[in-house]
């Protein structure tokens, strides 16, 4: 039963649907450029650079001539959270649409959406030239701290009001996104959720206790 008439369930990707925390960190780790990513993250969180500049610095720190194939190979080694397939099957059975809203990378979002039969996704993009080589400037669609903006844009496109949606994330970066839905859930191993409006869950399946 869908007591709240929920039409869409939107999920963060890294750390929520997937077990790992960041597709960007996975690529930095592969190329040995974690220190560059950490430095850019610090500047971003301190408000000294915006997210587009953060992306540009991340991408520029990777080796020149990197190909789409290599990036896709790094991102293909992902682990879907154990209960996630069950959750998406149940949402389909209830005729509730599904979406990913992630500040991660579109290559990964597209693959996970296909694996789990997720209806919609929005993510940040990498750009490649005609030979498949990485270009230094990405496509910024989802600011980590303002996922709600990308989410509202998606909802407007598909014609669903936010009051008929739920949102699920796992970090403080997701707060604006979670609060923009009818119900917001934070997947966390601690019971200390940083906002009283957000519902704490230990497993994704617990969203069904509330809808």
Positions of the model-derived regions?
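Short, basic/glycine-rich phosphate-binding loops at helix/coil junctions
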Residues: 54-71, 128-135
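Acidic, Mg2+-coordinating phosphoryl-transfer loop and its flanking beta/alpha structural elements
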Residues: 98-103, 162-202
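Short acidic-hydrophobic, aromatic-tinged amphipathic segments that line or gate anion-handling sites
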Residues: 122, 198-207
